[in-house]
Regions:
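Juxtamembrane/transmembrane-helix interface segments of polytopic membrane transporters
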Residues: 31, 35, 39, 43, ...
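Short alpha-helical transmembrane segments in multi-pass integral membrane proteins
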Residues: 1-21, 79-146, 188-245, 303-370, ...
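Transmembrane alpha-helix boundary and packing residues in multipass membrane permease domains
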Residues: 24, 28, 40, 77, ...
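Small-residue-rich hydrophobic transmembrane alpha-helices
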Residues: 51-111, 148-162, 166-167, 277-341, ...
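Short runs within selected transmembrane alpha-helices of multi-pass transporters and secretion channels
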Residues: 72, 141-160, 167-175, 196-211, ...
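Transmembrane helix-bundle signature of multi-pass secondary active exporters and lipid flippases
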Residues: 24-73, 77, 141-148, 239-305, ...
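Membrane-water interface regions at transmembrane-helix termini and the short interhelical loops
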Residues: 154-162, 182-191
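Helix-loop interface residues and adjacent transmembrane-helix termini in multi-pass membrane transporters
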Residues: 33-36, 45-48, 82-85, 160-161, ...
Length: 451
């Protein structure tokens, strides 16, 4: 989406969408593969306590990932809109301010994780062994927060500069490096969760460096230079980036908040085994979330560009194309989970842990039966973010967080572990119904205006 882009019409918009979506989906799935491989190695080498420790670290990891995505999505959206309007110097400014935010907020997140990791683990009810594993993991990740956040933001910025394939390669390099080092550090050297953390930081740092080099190279459509007078911190563009990307942060805060509530409730009404089973549902959810985020991210540059160019019909066409694929793949995955749950669960469980095997199968059936609606909510929030309607994007994500609380408070005392696992899908059904109504009203208004 730059000055060299050809005009996109309704005849070739599908091809343009897949040009962005396919590399993004591939990159998302491969980047998520290292998380899955982490879980496989930890489940087989460390066991249920290791899986529970990773899940209890997730509230902090989600905060870090969310801040990185907020900066990347906010800067990328404004960069694409500015390019669509023909304001190329302004687009460069958003890239520069995005990098400033990665540095400054990265330091803040590092301090929060290092200072608060043990308190949050204790709040979730972690026993001594789980707390030891999780605290060591978070210490390494915490010190490296700016680099990890940059690895999340950089592919989005590169993609919005018209280089989706390079964004995919960046994520592939980081993920494959992580997987190889996981095997060395966890299996061969026996470093446990600390080994997983070192592997993660190394792989993601490599990905971030590749993206940074591209932004300053002649191969970028908007090459940056340290000599630019705009290369200083500017409050207004930073505020615009943060406001636009805030819903992305909230999506991860929602995931962190959900993990915190579920971990605490499962330790109260169940045991470490139930938290480990919940962690396995999280890994399976990750596969679909990354697919949905990839399809939504592939939509974002096109929707932002068409919105900036005032082409509402093409905005609508791209959105509904992405929705068909998000919902369709979600339904297929849910059917597989309900019919063959053991295919997904047993790759994380050693033969010596039958209790976790039983708990995990029950957990995925109860917790994931409307997973496709979660994908729909991801896409809806991404759409509003892409058209710079941060208010509605934020509203969807905040509602997703708030609506779970009453379901957990009612179902947990009544049904115990079963009620805890049902809280998310039931609340998702309620929220998705409201979002469908919101979108139908908006697109009806758009059609009326176009007429």
């Amino acid at each position: 989406m730059n000055r060299r882009s050809i005009a996109i019409t309704s005849d070739n918009v599908t091809a343009a969408y897949w040009r962005y979506a396919l590399p993004t989906v591939m990159a998302m799935l491969v980047s998520g593969l290292y998380q899955i491989v982490d879980g496989i190695f930890i489940g087989h080498v460390v066991g249920a306590e290791g899986l529970a420790a990773i899940n209890m670290a997730w509230p902090w990891i989600g905060l870090m990932a969310g801040v990185g995505l907020m900066i990347g999505a906010g800067a990328g959206t404004h960069c694409s809109i500015a390019q669509g309007e023909g304001h190329f110097q302004r687009a460069k400014g958003f890239l520069i301010q995005g990098m400033w935010l990665l540095v400054l907020l990265g330091v803040v997140v590092s301090v929060l994780i290092i200072a608060g990791r043990d308190s949050l683990l204790a709040l979730q009810g972690a026993n001594a062994s789980v707390q030891r594993h999780s605290s060591g993991y978070l210490q390494i990740i915490g010190w490296s927060s700016p680099l990890v956040m940059a690895s999340i933001a950089m592919p989005i910025l590169v993609r919005n500069l018209g280089a989706p394939m390079l964004a995919t390669i960046m994520m592939l390099v980081g993920a494959l490096t992580n997987i190889v080092l996981d095997y060395v550090f966890i299996v061969q050297l026996g470093w446990g969760l600390q080994g997983a953390a070192i592997a993660t930081v190394t792989g993601e740092s490599l990905s971030a460096v590749i993206g940074l080099v591209f932004l300053f190279s002649r191969y970028s459509s908007l090459p940056l230079s340290l000599a630019l007078r705009e290369f200083c911190l500017q409050p207004l563009p930073c505020r615009q980036i943060l406001l636009n990307g805030f819903s992305s942060l909230l999506m991860y805060l929602y995931a962190s908040f959900a993990a915190l509530l579920h971990n605490t409730a499962l330790m109260h009404y169940g045991s470490t085994v139930n938290v480990a089973a919940y962690a396995i549902t999280g890994y399976l959810m990750t596969v679909y979330y990354l697919l949905a985020e990839g399809l939504a991210s592939g939509m974002q540059p096109l929707v932002s560009y068409f919105h900036g160019a005032g082409q509402s019909a093409l905005v609508r066409k791209v959105f509904f194309l992405a929705m068909r694929w998000v919902m369709g793949t979600g339904v297929v995955l849910v059917l597989m989970i309900l019919i063959f749950p053991y295919i997904g669960t047993r790759i994380f469980i050693s033969d010596e842990d039958p209790a976790l095997d039983v708990a995990a199968i029950d957990a995925v059936r109860l917790h994931l039966f409307v997973l496709f609606l979660d994908g729909f909510l991801v896409l809806a929030a991404a759409y509003y973010q892409a058209v710079s309607d941060s208010r509605r994007a934020t509203m969807i994500t905040l509602a997703n967080m708030c609506i779970q609380i009453p379901f957990l408070l009612i179902l947990a005392p009544w049904l115990g572990v079963t009620g805890i696992l049902l809280a998310l899908p039931l609340s998702t059904i309620v929220l998705a119904t409201g979002v469908v109504t919101l979108l139908r009203r908006q697109f009806s208004l758009r059609v009326g205006v176009n007429k």
